[in-house]
């Protein structure tokens, strides 16, 4: 259990998807204007990553990997060239299910997220989490913890950025750094702050 907890914490702080790998920056910058919306998208990313990472790991290990189809009588078959297409297809299906669920039960959040909800399908943070888990050959259980941790890390980062941006609305900032200029600087400073965790041994 300790190794799973270590993997979970490491994926939140040491290998943060947004502030270490700089993945998912399009939605990270665009949806971080309000804390409530940022938290909603963060929860959606956590759900999608927690499900899509282990599901795609299972698909790769049992169908796509070289020799994975030995159980079906095709030990020499290698379908790994279909990995990217398969991963995106699984992610798209999960996002579609999530979108329909939010539209049905949480219409206010669905309307607040707008176009960015279907864009989770092509959010490179989601795909990056899946690709990293497969590349590092995580087990199914490790994939669950890694997916949840990666999603939580991304959600934490966008929520913190949104909180700072809400405060900055009342700040008297120089003309040249208003808008996205200040957001890039804040994101950079946050990334530097998260880099301080790199010296921690977990």
UniProtKB/Swiss-Prot annotation:
Assembly with partners or alone: Composed of six subunits; NqrA, NqrB, NqrC, NqrD, NqrE and NqrF.
EC number: 7.2.1.1
A GO MF term: oxidoreductase activity, acting on NAD(P)H, quinone or similar compound as acceptor
Domain of life: Bacteria
Gene: nqrE
Residue spans crossing the bilayer: 11-31, 39-59, 79-99, 114-134, 144-164, 180-200
Keywords of the record: Cell inner membrane, Cell membrane, Ion transport, Membrane, NAD, Sodium, Sodium transport, Translocase, Transmembrane, Transmembrane helix, Transport, Ubiquinone
InterPro entries (UniProt xref): NqrDE/RnfAE, NqrDE/RnfAE_oxidrdctase, NqrE
Function: NQR complex catalyzes the reduction of ubiquinone-1 to ubiquinol by two successive reactions, coupled with the transport of Na(+) ions from the cytoplasm to the periplasm. NqrA to NqrE are probably involved in the second step, the conversion of ubisemiquinone to ubiquinol.
Catalytic activity: a ubiquinone + n Na(+)(in) + NADH + H(+) = a ubiquinol + n Na(+)(out) + NAD(+)
Topological type in the membrane: Multi-pass membrane protein
Name of the protein: Na(+)-translocating NADH-quinone reductase subunit E
Record bears the keyword Membrane: yes
Annotated family: Belongs to the NqrDE/RnfAE family.
Gene Ontology terms describing biological process: respiratory electron transport chain; sodium ion transport
